[in-house]
Regions:
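Short glycine-/polar-rich loops that comprise or flank the Walker A/P-loop
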Residues: 28, 55-58, 88-92, 163-164, ...
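Pre-Walker A adenine-sensing motif
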Residues: 12-24, 253-264
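Conserved P-loop
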Residues: 31, 36-101, 266-272, 276-343
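Conserved nucleotide-binding/hydrolysis micro-motifs of P-loop NTPases
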Residues: 65-70, 78, 98-103, 131-133, ...
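Conserved P-loop NTPase
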Residues: 1-8, 111, 118-120, 193-251, ...
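Scaffold/interface architecture of coatomer-like assemblies
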Residues: 30, 35-37, 44, 48, ...
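P-loop NTPase motor core
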Residues: 31, 107-184, 188, 341-428, ...
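Short beta-alpha junctions and helix-cap segments that line functional grooves
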Residues: 48, 171, 175-179, 190-193, ...
Length: 493
């Protein structure tokens, strides 16, 4: 029998943050939200406060030196989490201590905070910004980091004694993690903001959170009209990948291709369709989705190069897709911002899968996904794609991903350089252009199906006027088909 006393946690109200923290915010903990200007510290503090403030657990927001409350509220009210009713009934109160800080320094500020805590007994306390306090006292000829450390220790004792969950907001440069004031805190959340070319990338790190097993490392974040959001980084994809039986196979919807795959795609596999522009990658993936719908299986399509309306108008079987969308059998996700991260993309896909109960997914295309990512994330594209594929197949989803490659016949390459992503998928289907007897023709082949037998034939195919792929006969009797200019053939040419 365990003698441990469980620590109650509070929800942060910040999507994704509780998962990174391990289990929310420990009640009565003393926390620091730190980082450079513009990182979202004040927004996060407000979001946490409004989430947890109730008539039984009131909140007080102390602002020091920085923005007066009226100015701060003017901007914070734009976010969806802002609740004006909590201001009206006194559940949330704002107190500006700028004058006290200028006249009496840290000692006076501490006295006022202690008096207010004793009087109103709030359950949530925010102090913004404690770093501005030390700057003001230093400018006045007294104080410094040592005095700030003493201030922090005394403040922590007071707030802990009154059982308040506390958040201190402070501006620190990225390299200042070793400040003595951080030893006082139970939790330390660090917010980063970096500019990479023309993209702004936000990241969050939980440096410590006592009593909880947080997810280490940097996690992508974003500020929108809804507030601050975090996209947790999955560490070990293998832990979420389900072991699915190979005997359970699903159809591609393309007659002849299922036989080439050895009876269809094993359920829960990821398939890469690679080929040059216009070879029919999207056509094939559309057939896969439509076939699933006809069998009662819902699907999602993630697109990066066209808006959904344009995609549905130009895709070969757009009318059928529109019908499936109306019937809620299909969801088309448009993910095109030029500062995406894989984790943000994965969250969108996972939410869509769970929302409609999808078992089939198409990513069209990986080339478009790479372009949509912020430059800093392209460096880890292969690793990130591995995590994304593992997470989705772990949900029991069968994936088809398309990728465009130059139709170079010097070597047999399945994905564009420098990433080499072909080994990340369970099966590969290649599409090629061939020049035979003065005509431009198309051929496809199954290069691999992991742990399964498959056809070794290279077969010609056509794209019908109805927008479907029709697989023909094997191209026998030729030599050098993959060079683009084959010789021979059944007629001996």
């Amino acid at each position: 029998m365990s003698d441990r006393v469980p620590i109650r946690t509070l929800p942060s109200g910040v999507p994704g943050l509780d998962e990174v923290l391990g289990s929310g915010i420990p009640e009565f903990s003393f926390n620091l939200i730190a980082g450079g200007p513009g990182g979202g510290k004040t927004t996060m503090a407000h979001q946490i406060m409004f989430k947890n403030a109730t008539p039984a657990r009131k909140a007080v927001y102390f602002s020091i030196i920085g923005e007066p409350p009226i100015k701060m509220l003017r901007y914070q009210q734009q976010y969806a989490f802002f609740d004006a009713a909590k201001l009206g009934d006194g559940t949330v109160r704002f107190i500006h201590l700028g004058q006290q800080a200028l006249e009496g320094g840290m000692q006076k500020v501490l006295e006022v905070i202690e008096q207010e805590i004793e009087k109103s007994a709030p359950g949530i306390v925010v102090v913004d910004s404690f770093r501005a306090l030390v700057r003001s006292t230093v400018a006045a000829g007294s104080g410094g980091e040592r005095e700030l450390t003493d201030f922090m220790q005394r403040l922590a004792l007071v707030l802990t004694a009154y059982e308040a969950t506390t958040f201190l907001v402070g501006e620190y440069a990225d390299g200042e993690h070793d400040s003595a004031v951080f030893t006082v805190a139970d939790g330390l959340i660090w917010l980063y903001q970096a500019i990479d070319r023309n993209s702004v990338v936000r990241k969050l790190q939980v440096i410590k959170m006592r009593g909880q097993g947080q997810i280490p490392g940097l996690h992508t974040s974003r500020i929108t009209e809804a507030g601050y959001s975090v996209f947790p980084r999955l560490l070990k994809p293998a832990e979420v990948v389900a072991n699915l039986p190979l005997k359970h196979r699903i159809s591609t919807g393309v007659k002849g291709l299922d036989e080439m795959l050895g009876g269809g795609i094993p359920s829960g596999y990821s398939v890469l369709i690679t080929g040059p522009s216009g070879s029919g990658k999207t056509v094939l993936s559309n057939q896969f989705i439509i076939d699933g719908a006809e069998r009662g299986e819902k699907g999602i399509v993630a697109i990066f190069e066209k808006r959904p309306s344009d995609y549905l108008q130009t895709t070969p079987r757009g009318a059928e897709f529109e019908k499936l969308v109306r019937e809620k059998k299909l969801e088309v996700l448009y993910l095109r911002p030029l500062d995406l991260s894989i984790d943000e993309t994965l969250l969108e896909l996972q939410d869509a899968v769970k929302r409609i109960g999808a078992t089939r997914a198409v990513i069209d295309s990986l080339s478009g996904l790479e372009l949509a990512l912020a430059p800093t994330f392209r460096e880890d594209f292969r690793e990130s794609l591995y995590r994304m594929m593992g997470a989705l197949t772990g949900l029991g989803v069968t994936i088809i991903a398309t990728v465009e490659v130059a139709d170079s016949y010097i070597d047999l390459r399945f994905s564009p350089e420098p990433h080499g992503i072909a080994f990340l998928t369970d099966a590969i289907i290649i599409q090629r252009y061939l020049e035979i007897e003065g005509q431009l023709r198309r051929a496809l082949a199954v290069v691999k199906v992991r742990s399964s037998q498959h056809s070794k034939d290279l077969k010609e195919y056509e794209i019908s006027t109805e927008g479907g792929i029709i697989v023909g006969q094997p191209l026998t009797g030729y030599e050098g088909l993959l060079t683009g200019t084959p010789k021979g053939g059944e007629n001996g040419k």
